Curated annotation (Swiss-Prot):
Belongs to the PPR family. PCMP-E subfamily. One of its GO terms (biological process) is RNA modification. Disulfide bonds: none annotated. GO terms for molecular function: RNA binding. This is Pentatricopeptide repeat-containing protein At4g08210. The gene is PCMP-E100. The lineage of its organism: Eukaryota, Viridiplantae, Streptophyta, Embryophyta, Tracheophyta. It holds the Pfam family PPR_1.
Length: 686
């Protein structure tokens, strides 16, 4: 009978290991039939089998039906719940055992409970367990003490972890690696390296911990340790190589990436989804999309069950702004048997954002809802960004409020959308909420809030945001420095803007254009041209907006000759084709000077059809210079081109009244009444 029990127990354990579910059930049925199901030894093995099957409810049922239990019974259940990702259940069962006083915990139980405490962050219980370990003289157990160190590490309690580590007389490689991993996860790489050098015999796990830690920090030292690891004669495995490829992605190190690609092939990892994804990411981030696509297409058939590889290729297309290819790939994923995960859906939403396509976005949004990812940490934030980006601020705001975890991505997307759509008050409110929550406003959020200050000419708020920039070290960042200059310029404090601009370490065409436009807006046209020439002298090419800033400055200051010269320079020296706005500045100046023939010639030479603004500008000048003949021509152009625009009739009425052309004025007012336009200068007070 004893032999039979051992054979039955061995059979149950084997079924659990090889996942032979039906055979295991059959053996359990035999156990019940033989009337030995209440045998503690057999019942424990039945529980162990169900734990291996990850059928914890069945295991718990057997547990509850037992008339007698021992410490193995309790430990198997607690370990099972912990391993199955249900640490709260494990802790609950441990407390139940203590309350029942059926059994005293042993080192295996303590180890399982400490692991559960680490997962849920129950440090208080963990400390009580640690005290019990001390009272029972179990601190000499390396495996158990490793569990203590691991619990502290998982919860970022590195001082306590280090203290517990020092109590281990002969630390194992697991002891060292657990503590090194803790420092790496906390970003304390100098401490991790120091500990690594103290370790008697670092193994593959030790090296991988350091390499992974440097990758997480975006540090090129990851590659330094990868090379050192290989020189030490250790094998670069399926963890180290993808980490190395990721490090190459950060630095755009294509040559090194190709060398690691060879290592992947030599190591036989070319069919590993993890390695393939890393290769695709590396080539995509290094701007070699053709190589990335080659890797993807070569391995697609072998790994078509791994959505991670498809996600990497989708991300690669998006990084390189190949939106059409990304959309095509998304369609392929949809038509395959692959299930969309949060990364796939995030990629799909980014395509919609890039296309600014609300219709497509709503379709993807429906797919997100069906897939159950609407309130996902990543997907939810990008959904907010999508709706905000297309101007659908109301829906974006509703989605934002429904998110259980509002991260910086969600705030950033909504604030940017609000600024873009002119919801300045909401943008300010969101910014204040972000600060209250203790979230770290990045330079892009700050630059958007500065745009709000510029739009509202809110100097007080602008100065407060400037203070925040100094505190966070953003003042020297190009994106925030440019926004600060723009804010001071638009708030009328151009001298402060100039000081900031002159102190910028990096100045691109956008920042130069901003200060040039600012000088023009503040009537300092000479300085606008002086800074323009400074920009040219250091080799920065002006763009169309730069020239528009100069021409606007000339228009405001009545500098016709300078405007003529600037327009010609723009075309002949820089090959830039002017927009209507550029021509408008010169036409307006010619009109102000009464040079109507030259203005008309310029309009006729324009490669663009003149718009209402240009004709209206010339119309106003005709009134000033009493040019009734040209007014008739312009009136014909305006009425033919913009017959339904009430402002056209208002402008014509003003011109006719100025010139005393009463018959024409009467006709225009009659036409305006038919259109439903309100006559200029007329109001009724009831």
């Amino acid at each position: 009978m004893v032999m039979d029990l051992k054979l039955i127990a061995a059979g149950l354990r084997h079924c659990g290991k090889v996942q032979a579910f039906k055979r295991g059930e059959s053996i359990q049925a035999h156990v019940i039939k033989q009337g030995i199901s209440q045998n503690v030894f057999i019942a424990n093995n039945v529980i162990s089998m169900y734990v291996d099957f990850r059928l914890l409810s069945d295991a718990h049922k057997v547990f509850d039906e037992m008339s007698e239990r021992n410490i193995v019974t309790w430990t198997t259940m607690v370990s099972g719940y912990t391993s199955d990702g249900k640490p709260n259940k494990a802790i609950e069962l441990y407390r139940r055992m203590l309350d029942s006083e059926e059994e005293a915990a042993n080192e295996f139980m303590y180890s399982a409970v400490l692991k559960a405490c680490g997962l849920v962050g129950d440090i208080q219980l963990g400390i009580l367990v640690y005290e019990r370990i001390g009272k029972e003289n179990l601190r000499g157990d390396v495996v158990l003490m490793n569990s203590v160190v691991d619990m502290y590490v998982k919860n970022g309690r590195l001082i306590e972890a280090n203290s517990s580590f020092k109590e281990i007389l002969r630390p194992s490689s697991t002891s060292w690696n657990t503590l090194i991993s803790g420092y790496c996860k906390a970003g304390l790489m100098d401490e991790a390296v120091t500990l690594f050098h103290r370790m008697p015999q670092p193994n593959v796990v030790s090296w991988n911990c350091l390499i992974s830690g440097f990758v997480d920090k975006g540090s090129p030292r990851a590659l330094e340790f990868l090379v050192r690891m290989q020189r030490e004669g250790l094998v670069l495995d399926g963890f180290a190589l993808p980490c190395g490829l990721k490090a190459c992605s950060f630095g755009g190190l294509l040559t090194m990436g190709k060398q690691l690609h060879c290592c992947v092939v030599k190591s036989g990892l070319e069919s590993s989804p993890f390695a393939i994804s890393a290769l695709i990411d590396m080539y995509s981030n290094c701007g070699s999309l053709i190589y990335a696509a080659d890797v993807f297409h070569q391995e697609k058939l072998a790994v078509n069950s791994s959505v991670a590889v498809w996600n990497s290729m989708l991300s690669g297309f998006l990084i390189n702004e190949e939106n059409e290819a990304a959309l095509w790939l998304l369609l392929q994923i949809y038509q395959s048997d692959l299930c969309f995960d949060s990364y796939t859906l995030s990629g799909a939403l980014k395509i919609c954002i890039n296309y600014v396509n609300l219709r497509l976005g709503l379709q993807v949004h429906s797919l997100v809802v069906v897939s159950g990812y609407e309130l996902d940490y990543i997907v939810g934030s990008i959904l907010v960004d999508l709706h905000a980006n297309v101007g659908n601020i109301q829906d974006a705001h509703k989605l934002f409020h429904r998110l259980p975890n509002k991260d910086i991505i969600a705030f950033s997307g909504l604030i940017r959308g609000c600024v873009k759509s002119g919801f300045n008050s909401l943008a300010f409110y969101l910014f204040r909420e972000l600060i209250k929550l203790g979230l770290d406003a990045d330079q892009f959020i700050v630059s958007n809030i500065l745009k709000v200050c510029s739009s509202l000419a809110s100097l007080g708020w602008g100065k407060q945001i400037h203070g925040l920039c100094i505190k966070k070290g953003y003042e020297s960042e190009p994106v925030t420095a440019t926004a600060l200059v723009d804010m001071y310029v638009k708030c009328g404090e151009i001298d402060n803007g100039v000081v900031l601009f002159d102190g910028m370490l990096e100045r691109d065409v956008v920042s130069w254009t901003g200060i040039i436009v600012g000088f023009g807006q503040n009537g300092r046209v000479e300085e606008a041209f002086r800074y323009f020439h400074k920009m040219i002298n250091i080799g920065i090419e002006p763009n169309k907006v730069t020239f528009l800033g100069l021409l606007s400055a000339c228009r405001h200051s009545g500098l016709l000759e300078e405007a003529r010269s600037t327009l010609e320079t723009m075309k002949s020296e820089y090959g830039l084709e002017p927009y209507l706005e550029h021509y408008y500045c010169v036409v307006d100046l010619l009109g102000q000077a009464g040079l109507f023939q030259e203005a008309n010639e310029l309009i006729n030479k324009m490669p663009l059809e003149p718009d209402k603004t240009i004709w209206t500008s010339l119309l106003t000048a005709c009134g000033t210079h009493k040019n009734a003949g040209l007014v008739t021509v312009i009136a014909e152009k305006l009425l033919k081109g913009f017959p339904d625009d009430p402002s056209v009739y208002t402008s014509l009425s003003n011109a006719y009244a100025t010139l005393g052309m009463w018959d024409q004025l009467s006709k225009v007012r009659e036409a305006a009444k038919k259109l439903g336009a309100k006559e200029s200068g007329m109001s009724w007070i009831i």
